[in-house]
Design a protein with these regions (language model features):
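N-terminal hydrophobic or amphipathic helices and topogenic motifs
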Residues: 1-81, 215-217, 228-261
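Conserved hydrophobic residue
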Residues: 14-16, 91, 186
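Periplasmic-binding protein-like
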Residues: 30-31, 114-132, 202-238, 258-259
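Mid-protein regulatory/catalytic core that forms ligand/cofactor-binding pockets
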Residues: 45-155
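Active-site regions of enzymes building and remodeling cell-envelope glycoconjugates
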Residues: 69, 110-113, 163-169, 202-209
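Short helix-initiation/N-cap motifs at beta->coil->alpha
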Residues: 73-85, 168-182
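A ligand-binding cleft/hinge motif common to bilobed small-molecule-binding domains
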Residues: 95-108, 179-209
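C-terminal regulatory
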Residues: 139-177
């Protein structure tokens, strides 16, 4: 311990003050220097493309709370691929839905959840969009949007179409759902309400999914790391506080602070 403290002091990562018989206390820490001493590379996280205000707020919040560190975010589609890259050590952590994190952990033991950012931190909610304004839900013979690259959209779609005969899945990216419905390519599709509101889409037949699917875990953001990275886990739990992340997200939504990611 003494050798480690001496090394950190020499590197300018820690300042110590002696208080006689009371011992030696840490007076100041330089977290960026500590990171350089304790990690062989900068802190690199990943999350979905910031196409919605919720994601933009989340990205801004992460940069703010981790400002003392050499930190960068990579934006990429597909929670499954992001989780795999965390397991391989390419990213130190990723942000995905709590549903995606828990589902992945049922089939693998090399990742773990380091933080839960609370309901609504990932997105407000998923909804069902229908082309027929008279329809009350998905019916036999409908053409339904299906995005194999989006675990959340794919699994919600599987849940709400289970047992319905004659469904024809039309493969397309989830973000193309609205245009596909308006263009007559599909009859139904699952998409998130944030994007619908923020894009100002009008005249859509929207059905809430709360009565059909437990959407809470799809709306909750989770921080996932490689299992066994205890120092990283403690760092994230100390600095990425749910209350602070949510406040920054809300400030972004209300226009109180600028987006910065």
């Amino acid at each position: 311990v003494q050798n480690s403290l001496a090394y950190l002091k020499e590197k300018g990562a820690v300042w110590l003050v002696s208080r006689g018989h009371m011992g030696t206390y840490i007076e100041k820490l330089d977290y960026r220097r500590l990171q350089e001493c304790g990690m062989n590379k900068g802190l690199l996280g990943s999350m979905p493309l910031p196409y919605s205000v919720s994601y933009q707020g989340l990205a801004t919040a992460l940069y703010r709370v981790l400002d003392n560190f050499e930190f960068n975010l990579v934006y990429t589609r597909g929670s499954e691929s992001r989780l795999q890259l965390v397991a391989e050590g390419v990213y130190q952590f990723t942000v995905c839905s709590l549903y995606a994190a828990e589902k992945a952990m049922k089939n693998r033991t090399d990742i773990e959840i380091a933080g839960n950012l609370g309901l609504g931190s990932y997105l407000s909610r998923h909804v069902l969009l229908l082309r027929d304004i008279g329809a009350e839900g998905i019916q036999e013979g409908m053409r339904v949007a299906y995005d194999r690259t989006s675990l959340d959209q794919r699994d919600i779609t599987d849940m709400i179409t289970s047992g319905i005969r004659g469904i024809r899945f039309v493969e397309l990216r989830a973000h193309q759902t609205v245009n596909a419905i308006r263009g007559g390519m599909i009859d139904a599709g699952v998409w998130n309400m944030d994007e619908i509101i923020e894009s100002g889409y009008q005249g859509l037949h929207i059905i809430p999914l709360d009565d059909l699917v437990d959407v809470s875990k799809f709306s909750t953001a989770a921080l996932v790391i490689r299992r066994g990275e205890e120092s990283l886990k403690q760092l994230l739990q100390r600095y990425v506080k749910t209350s602070e992340i949510r406040k920054i997200q809300e400030d972004i939504k209300k226009g109180r602070i600028p987006v910065d990611y």
